[in-house]
Structure formats: structure tokens, C-alpha cells
């Protein structure tokens, strides 16, 4: 069964064809990073206009790469939230138009669930129950999965998401956008020598990174940062220490079989290394190309929802504020 996935929640226009939820036949992404980097962040209006220009060519390219026509597509899976409203609308309207014109079933996919399903495209099928650490620019969640479509939120950020914290730290240190990769690169040439705080929030699986960001800002303002690379390494280590420690504690408490890593921040080298080395449980870590926004993960998630009877009407709407558990 072939699923066409469409993703346009932020600043990537993406389309993919995935067979049976696990085999990627194509995965095309048109990135807007170069456009938004001059502004130091994503400009919603600019993102929407670029999606309009890119969406149909990207879908066409995905079908060509997969050597597939619409007559072989069993369903169209499209991200309907969370994300930027104007960006989401472009992908959803394209999916609706194709579904209506071709008589193909439509499946709405939660972008956060899509990130998790990168682990079904990584060569080994995860075991339930599993704990997923989803870390991105807008979300930092610990989610228990007992089966397909079964999500229980165990922990979340109370302020800044991990990816947002990296972006802000990069701006404080004068590094480039996007901040996560910039911090990661700078850290390769630095040492984690700065004493930065870690917010543990005893008795909770929640996260908090705003205090860490403020502490870094104060050090910079007071002239106590001599090396940008050391500061980046210190900030990254503080974030990763909290992410890994709280994930392992949560996994032990809920007696899961496996830990899954997902989201854009899952591309961080230290996080991937530290979680793998410190976990007593098997850890599934997707290839870096599947951590950032793409449509293959949307198609995979959509497949499992579709075979379980999930299908949406053509009046389905975008949900910009959708959470991992709705």
C-alpha cells in the first residue's frame, strides 16, 4: 500500500511516497532556510508564499522519484497541525484538492506524531510499550506509546522548548540561524567548562530551559564568556544532561521496552551519543535526514492511522495549536 505524504507545517515544503508504512520510495524536501536565515528566524508570511510556489513541483517530484502515479496511491496523508496556520493551509488545501479530484482517501496527521514515526523508517520496528522523547523547536515532550495511535503525555516543557532554547542561545552567542546546528558545530571545538544551571523539577517529568538561557545571557552581558565555542559546548551539555536524565528516569518508572528519539533536535550529536551510551534499554535513533521536517514520516504515520480506519472528510481544518495528545 502506497501513501503520499505532504508536509508544510513550518518552512519546509515536502512530499514523499512510502509503502506499507516502512519503505521510503521517495522523500523530497524544498527547504527555505536560506530565505529565512537573513531574518534570523522564520517569517510566517514569507513561508506561506514560498510553500505556494513549491508545493505542486515537490509533489510531482516525489511521485516521479517513486515511479508512481495517483492511481497507485491508496491515501494522502497531510500534516494539519501543529504549525504556522498559513503554512499548514497550503499543504492541506493541496491534499484536499488532489483527494477530491482523484477520489483518494484523506488522512490528517499530527506533525508531532509524524516525528515519532521516523523510527518506523529506520530499519527496525520499535517495540511497544515505548517511550518517545520528541524534541524540536516548538516542543519537548515525553510520550508513552502502548500501540499505534495510543499516546500518553508524561512530560513536557513548561517554557522554552529545547530547540527554541538552542536558537536563543545561538543569538546570544552571535551564531548563525538555525541555532541548533550552529550550537552543535561550535561545540565540536569547545569544552563544557562553564557552570550553567540545570532545572530538574523534582517530582515531575516536565522540562524547563528558560533559566538556563537567562544564565547564559547574564554571563555574556557580564563579560564572563571568553570562548564562544566553550559557551556553546557548556549550554549544549546542560540541555542534553537534562533531556537524557529525565528520559531515562521516566523510562524506568513506566517499565518500557524501548526509548525512541524524534524531532529536529534529535539530530544533535551529543544527544544521540549520550542517550545511546547511558540508556540500559535499546534506543531507536532515526537517521539525521528523518529528524528534521519531511513528508516520509507523515506518510508512515498516516499509513498506520489509515489501516486502523482513520480517514478524514474534505472539510478537515488546520489546527495550528494541536498538541501531541489531543
Swiss-Prot record:
What the entry lists under Pfam families is as follows: TsaD
Compartments it resides in: Cytoplasm
Positions bound to Fe cation: 111, 115, 293
Provide the E.C. number(s) assigned to this enzyme.
2.3.1.234
The GO molecular function terms of this record are: iron ion binding; N(6)-L-threonylcarbamoyladenine synthase activity
Name any cofactors this protein relies on.
Fe(2+)
Q: How is the cofactor bound?
A: Binds 1 Fe(2+) ion per subunit.
Please list the GO biological process terms of this entry: tRNA threonylcarbamoyladenosine modification
Signal sequence bounds: none
Protein task: Required for the formation of a threonylcarbamoyl group on adenosine at position 37 (t(6)A37) in tRNAs that read codons beginning with adenine. Is involved in the transfer of the threonylcarbamoyl moiety of threonylcarbamoyl-AMP (TC-AMP) to the N6 group of A37, together with TsaE and TsaB. TsaD likely plays a direct catalytic role in this reaction.
Please report the name of this protein according to its UniProt entry.
tRNA N6-adenosine threonylcarbamoyltransferase
Q: Which organism is it from?
A: Dehalococcoides mccartyi (strain ATCC BAA-2266 / KCTC 15142 / 195)
Amino acid at each position: 500500500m502506497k501513501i503520499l505524504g505532504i508536509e508544510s507545517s513550518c518552512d519546509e515544503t515536502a512530499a514523499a511516497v512510502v509503502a506499507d508504512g516502512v519503505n521510503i520510495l521517495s522523500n523530497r524536501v524544498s527547504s527555505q532556510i536560506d530565505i529565512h536565515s537573513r531574518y534570523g528566524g522564520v517569517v510566517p508570511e514569507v513561508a506561506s508564499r514560498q510553500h505556494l510556489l513549491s508545493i505542486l513541483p515537490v509533489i510531482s517530484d516525489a511521485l516521479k522519484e517513486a515511479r508512481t502515479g495517483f492511481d497507485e496511491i491508496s491515501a494522502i496523508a497531510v500534516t494539519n497541525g501543529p504549525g504556522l496556520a498559513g503554512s499548514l493551509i497550503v499543504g492541506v488545501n493541496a491534499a484536499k484538492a488532489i483527494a477530491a479530484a482523484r477520489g483518494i482517501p484523506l488522512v490528517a496527521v499530527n506533525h508531532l506524531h509524524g516525528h515519532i514515526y521516523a523510527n518506523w523508517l529506520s530499519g527496525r520496528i520499535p517495540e511497544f510499550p515505548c517511550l518517545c522523547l520528541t524534541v524540536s523547536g516548538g516542543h519537548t515532550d515525553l510520550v508513552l506509546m502502548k500501540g499505534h495511535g495510543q499516546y500518553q503525555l508524561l512530560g513536557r516543557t513548561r517554557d522554552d522548548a529545547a530547540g527554541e532554547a538552542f536558537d536563543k542561545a545561538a543569538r546570544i552567542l552571535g551564531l548563525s540561524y538555525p541555532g541548533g546546528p550552529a550550537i552543535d558545530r561550535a561545540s565540536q571545538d569547545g569544552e563544557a567548562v562553564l557552570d550553567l544551571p540545570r532545572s530538574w523539577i523534582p517530582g515531575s517529568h516536565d522540562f524547563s530551559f528558560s533559566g538556563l538561557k537567562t544564565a547564559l545571557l547574564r554571563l555574556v552581558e557580564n563579560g564572563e564568556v571568553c570562548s564562544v565555542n566553550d559557551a556553546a559546548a557548556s549550554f549544549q551539555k546542560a540541555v542534553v544532561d537534562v533531556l537524557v536524565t529525565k528520559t531515562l528516569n521516566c523510562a524506568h518508572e513506566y517499565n518500557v521496552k524501548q526509548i525512541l528519539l524524534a524531532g529536529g533536535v534529535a539530530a544533535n550529536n551529543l544527544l544521540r551519543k549520550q542517550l545511546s551510551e547511558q540508556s540500559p534499554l535499546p534506543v531507536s535513533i532515526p537517521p539525521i535526514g528523518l529528524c528534521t521536517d519531511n513528508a516520509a514520516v507523515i506518510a508512515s504515520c498516516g499509513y498506520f492511522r489509515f489501516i486502523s480506519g482513520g480517514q478524514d472528510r474534505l472539510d478537515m481544518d488546520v489546527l495550528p495549536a494541536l498538541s501531541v495528545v489531543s
